[in-house]
């Protein structure tokens, strides 16, 4: 039985789709990812690539390739005759969801953020079911909306009480990562000497800046490990005492489920400012602190980081507060819904 997963190639959309595909496979379903060209290197799940262009590029080309991709998706979906198309948001999911609507194939939507994305909003009325990652999601209201959680498999782990080194994990994400390379690393390097001796930094950097940031840390005698991408995020989170991160939905789910305190720096250009609202939900539960990316960001981040590293009780309180957020791994619950619907 085939199910098509319509998703975007960025981590926030693709990783939940991959997690769901693996879970559905154990129940006998064959899942095919329909997405854009950025996905192939990220997964071994069967996929079909649509020749899309980013909305921020040439507008004429964007709409031209969107129409072309919609025609390709219509042909492929008609040929596959799937039981359902599950959309994960992003402009890359639009052609496949449109094909499903034209062909009267049941549409199910999953929303990762606290604000229902524009493509998911467009297909809201056509969808049989909308699953959300946060207990509260703007624009997702009605009987067909259910809170399942995001699709991440991260478990909470405790720290060793005898550990004297504080591990700081810095997750830049795919959007605006240069800010983390420049500002976050600079703030860490400007900490007092005694504090720098007590920290270890694990940081995701852009490929072009890895050596530059590593040299900066070494010049300040800061123990560090840097990489463009970490494929063992669960282990990295398990070892972290504090996380500095963008506020993408998947990152927040992983950090919160790992029971880690965090400083979130929302990407200021995210659609509908959804990263800010994602982080605000966690901050309202006192499990994180938001630092906005603006002209005062360096000063504000310095103050927040200094305060947290000087106050172990505050860090512990934030860690304990992660359980109050209600964030959960929704994979098992969502699979049960799918199995029940199509059994």
Swiss-Prot record:
Q: Which residues bind UDP-N-acetyl-alpha-D-glucosamine?
A: 10-12, 113, 174, 275
The UniProt catalytic activity note for this protein reads:
di-trans,octa-cis-undecaprenyl diphospho-N-acetyl-alpha-D-muramoyl-L-alanyl-D-glutamyl-meso-2,6-diaminopimeloyl-D-alanyl-D-alanine + UDP-N-acetyl-alpha-D-glucosamine = di-trans,octa-cis-undecaprenyl diphospho-[N-acetyl-alpha-D-glucosaminyl-(1->4)]-N-acetyl-alpha-D-muramoyl-L-alanyl-D-glutamyl-meso-2,6-diaminopimeloyl-D-alanyl-D-alanine + UDP + H(+)
This enzyme's EC code(s): 2.4.1.227
Where does it live in the cell? Answer: Cell membrane
* GO biological process terms, semicolon-separated: carbohydrate metabolic process; cell division; cell wall organization; lipid glycosylation; peptidoglycan biosynthetic process; regulation of cell shape
Report the superkingdom from the record: Bacteria
In the UniProt record, which is one GO cellular component term? plasma membrane
Name the pathway: Cell wall biogenesis; peptidoglycan biosynthesis
- Where the protein is mainly located, per its record? membrane
What are the protein's UniProt keywords? Cell cycle, Cell division, Cell membrane, Cell shape, Cell wall biogenesis/degradation, Glycosyltransferase, Membrane, Peptidoglycan synthesis, Transferase
> According to Swiss-Prot or TrEMBL, what is its membrane topology?
Peripheral membrane protein
* An annotated Gene Ontology molecular function: UDP-N-acetyl-D-glucosamine:N-acetylmuramoyl-L-alanyl-D-glutamyl-meso-2,6-diaminopimelyl-D-alanyl-D-alanine-diphosphoundecaprenol 4-beta-N-acetylglucosaminlytransferase activity
SUPFAM superfamilies found in the cross-reference section: UDP-Glycosyltransferase/glycogen phosphorylase (SSF53756)
Q: Which family is this sequence assigned to?
A: Belongs to the glycosyltransferase 28 family. MurG subfamily.
What NCBIfam families does its record include?
murG (TIGR01133)
State what this protein does.
Answer: Cell wall formation. Catalyzes the transfer of a GlcNAc subunit on undecaprenyl-pyrophosphoryl-MurNAc-pentapeptide (lipid intermediate I) to form undecaprenyl-pyrophosphoryl-MurNAc-(pentapeptide)GlcNAc (lipid intermediate II).
Name of the protein in question: UDP-N-acetylglucosamine--N-acetylmuramyl-(pentapeptide) pyrophosphoryl-undecaprenol N-acetylglucosamine transferase
Q: Which organism is it from?
A: Wolbachia sp. subsp. Drosophila simulans (strain wRi)
The gene from which this protein is expressed is murG
């Amino acid at each position: 039985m085939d199910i098509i997963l319509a998703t975007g190639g960025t981590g926030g959309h693709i990783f939940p789709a991959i997690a769901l595909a693996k879970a559905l496979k154990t129940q006998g379903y064959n899942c095919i990812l329909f997405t854009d060209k950025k996905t192939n290197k990220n997964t071994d799940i069967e996929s079909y690539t649509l020749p899309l262009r980013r909305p921020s590029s040439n507008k004429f080309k964007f709409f031209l390739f969107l129409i072309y991709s919609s025609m390709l998706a219509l042909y492929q979906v008609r040929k596959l005759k799937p039981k359902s198309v599950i959309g994960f948001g992003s402009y890359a999911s639009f052609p496949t969801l449109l094909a499903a609507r034209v062909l009267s194939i049941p549409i199910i939507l999953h929303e990762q953020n606290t604000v229902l994305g524009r493509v998911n909003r467009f297909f809201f009325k056509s969808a049989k079911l909308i699953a959300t990652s946060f207990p509260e999601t703007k624009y997702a209201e009605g009987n067909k909306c259910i809170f399942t959680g995001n699709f991440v498999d991260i478990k909470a782990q405790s720290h060793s009480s005898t550990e004297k080194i504080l591990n700081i994990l810095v997750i830049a994400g795919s959007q605006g990562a240069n800010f983390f390379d420049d500002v976050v690393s600079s703030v860490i390097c400007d900490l007092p000497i005694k504090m720098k001796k007590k920290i270890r930094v694990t940081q995701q950097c852009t490929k072009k800046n890895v050596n530059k940031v590593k040299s900066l840390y070494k010049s300040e005698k800061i123990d560090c490990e840097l990489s463009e991408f970490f494929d063992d995020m669960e282990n990295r989170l398990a070892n972290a005492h504090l996380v500095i991160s963008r506020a993408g939905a998947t990152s927040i789910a992983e950090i919160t489920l790992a029971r880690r305190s965090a400083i979130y720096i929302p990407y200021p250009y995210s659609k509908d400012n959804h990263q800010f609202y994602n982080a605000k939900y966690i901050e309202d539960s006192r499990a994180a602190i938001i630092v906005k990316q603006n002209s005062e960001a360096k000063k504000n981040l310095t103050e927040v980081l200094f305060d947290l590293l000087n106050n172990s009780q505050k860090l512990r309180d934030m860690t304990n507060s992660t359980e109050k957020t209600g964030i959960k791994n929704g994979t098992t619950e969502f699979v049960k819904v799918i199995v029940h619907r199509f059994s």
